[in-house]
Amino acid sequence: MNAEIIAVGSELLLGQIANTNAQFLSEKLAELGINVYFHTVVGDNAGRLEQAVRVAQARAELIIFTGGLGPTKDDLTKETIARLLGRELVIDEEALRSIEAYFARTNRTMTENNKKQALVLQGSTILKNEHGMAPGMAITLNSITYMLLPGPPKEMQPMFLKYGRPFLMEQLGRHERIESRVLRFFGIGESQLETDIEDLIDQQSNPTIAPLAGDGEVALRLTAKHHSEIEAKKLLDKAEQAILERVGRYFYGYNDETLFKKTVKMLKEKKKTIAAAESLTGGLFLTELTAIPGASQVVRGGVVCYANEVKEKVLHVPASVLTTDGAVSERCAQLLAENVRTLCHADIGISFTGVAGPDPLEGKPVGTVYIGISTPENETEVYALALPGQRDAIRIRTAKYGCSIILKKLAAAYEG
């Protein structure tokens, strides 16, 4: 099945909000084996929406709309689709009662235009809105399925997962299982990873292998279909094994796992604590770690040592090192890692120093990075990197490289 997603709302065209609904729906439809070939964004204009629908009808078997189901005059999705399909709009009594109950519960006066939110396409399947007022709806006519969903993500996402997805699975007449798995990699570019497994991607039709890139990471989505859930998972296992035989050294996790989540998880498993001295990253590393539930079990603390004075007075980096080697140097990174570990009584000390830009520093180019790792068992190691990108990209990639290094150290040094 081929699909098109039409997002309705002038605020999207004006760039006032991001179209996260299309991203969410594309991901979920891919898991169902539905091909999303087009994303369309239309402002609050009935004529242009009608034009977009006619284009979509010529190239898609499933058209999903987000937005335009509200009570105001510029909420015109239902009216436009009803006119195009020759369907009347009728009141859904359950939705109307829910809207009336909301206004009564909040002690507010319900204006007449709010009844508009209870209007649905005659003959459609109602998708309940358990997080808002306007229900969604779905209907199939002339071999095309139309699904109308609310615009707010907090309403749209749970509605689709609970009611929209089952509707589509029934429409597909699908008794086979669709299993999906995301493999996450760091330290390898998308082009290199794809080159390393190009023949696997070309040969695979079940499961399919789709590369995904973002924020200095690469992911592969594997999607398998089979009448048996067990057999579908076996197909995924076989494909995963073939991929990891080639690029396994860059692999770190599955699905929605992040490098920061994996780092906290492994520190817990190994019963190790960590402290950080952050110059280049300015606290970003510990901010990301401590956003993970349970991080308090493994994070001892840290120092944002942006100024050389702090490096010297708090973390005891000698002035001679800062003068001779520089703040952006292997020696400075080494001392920062060792001294923050001692200061915070942690098992592992990590340091970040470098040049994020936009200008060079101490004669070193933008993207120069040093990451120090100190443990009681081993001599402190310093990793020198040359990272591409703008300032923010360099900082987040540096923090992620720190996680990657820690994960490898934990796996190698603390087995068992």
UniProtKB/Swiss-Prot annotation:
InterPro entries in the record: CinA, CinA-like_C, CinA_C, CinA_KH, Competence-induced_CinA, MoaB/Mog-like_dom_sf, MoaB/Mog_dom
Tree of life domain: Bacteria
UniProt-listed CDD domains: cinA (cd00885)
SMART domains hit by this protein: MoCF_biosynth (SM00852)
Pfam family, one: CinA
Cross-referenced NCBIfam families: cinA_nterm, molyb_syn, PncC_domain, PRK00549.1
Family: Belongs to the CinA family.
Database matches in PANTHER family: NICOTINAMIDE-NUCLEOTIDE AMIDOHYDROLASE PNCC, NMN AMIDOHYDROLASE-LIKE PROTEIN YFAY
Protein name: Putative competence-damage inducible protein
Organism whose genome encodes this protein: Geobacillus sp. (strain WCH70)
